[in-house]
Structures are given as C-alpha cells and as structure tokens.
C-alpha cells in the first residue's frame, strides 16, 4: 500500500492529548510512526557531555506518534481530508478526495 502522508505535509492530530493541533511532518519512521514539529512534546533529561560540547539539562523534543492518529490538512478548506491516488501524464499523484485538488 502506498504512503498517503509524506514528509513536509501539513497534518492535523485527530485523536489523543494533542487533538486539534497542526504541524509539519519532520520524519516518517518505518514502524508506522511520524514525528511532527511542535506536537507530542516530551521532556528529556540530558546528561552533560563535555567531549561533544553538549550542556546538560531538561530539553523538550517531539516524540513519535502513530500515523493513524493524524490526517492531512487540506489548505483550501482548512479541515482534515482523505487522500487518493490517480494517474496524470503517466505519473502517480495524490489528490484530496473532498475537492479533487492535487496535494502540494
């Protein structure tokens, strides 16, 4: 099955503690999870490492979340939408199912 959500897509969280938040996908992991900028943030306790010039402390970073918990955001309507595939000029392209516009 083809991947309907890719890197740099605008998505909206549809379930969980961050429901309703939007962001851009930074990474798509192979185990069915994604990392979204500014969503699902966790606090990590970082040990100082003088050899790598890394200061210690508590840092916030985005944690992976299930790809099924997000939907792609349609920029024309501002709402969550479903994605389909079709052939145009011999290339497989993604489109929004609500208004048949291509995903940019």
UniProtKB/Swiss-Prot annotation:
GO MF annotation terms: rRNA binding; structural constituent of ribosome
Signal peptide segment: none
Superkingdom: Bacteria
Biological process per Gene Ontology, one example term: translation
Family annotation (SUPFAM superfamilies): Translation proteins SH3-like domain (SSF50104)
InterPro entries: KOW (IPR005824), Rib_uL2_dom2 (IPR014722), Ribosomal_uL24 (IPR003256), Ribosomal_uL24_CS (IPR005825), Ribosomal_uL24_KOW (IPR041988), Translation_prot_SH3-like_sf (IPR008991)
Family: Belongs to the universal ribosomal protein uL24 family.
Function description: One of two assembly initiator proteins, it binds directly to the 5'-end of the 23S rRNA, where it nucleates assembly of the 50S subunit. One of the proteins that surrounds the polypeptide exit tunnel on the outside of the subunit.
Subunit structure of this chain's protein: Part of the 50S ribosomal subunit.
PANTHER family reported in the protein's UniProt record: MITOCHONDRIAL RIBOSOMAL PROTEIN L24
Database matches in HAMAP family: Ribosomal_uL24_B
Stated name of the protein: Large ribosomal subunit protein uL24
Lineage per the UniProt record: Bacteria, Pseudomonadati, Pseudomonadota, Gammaproteobacteria, Alteromonadales
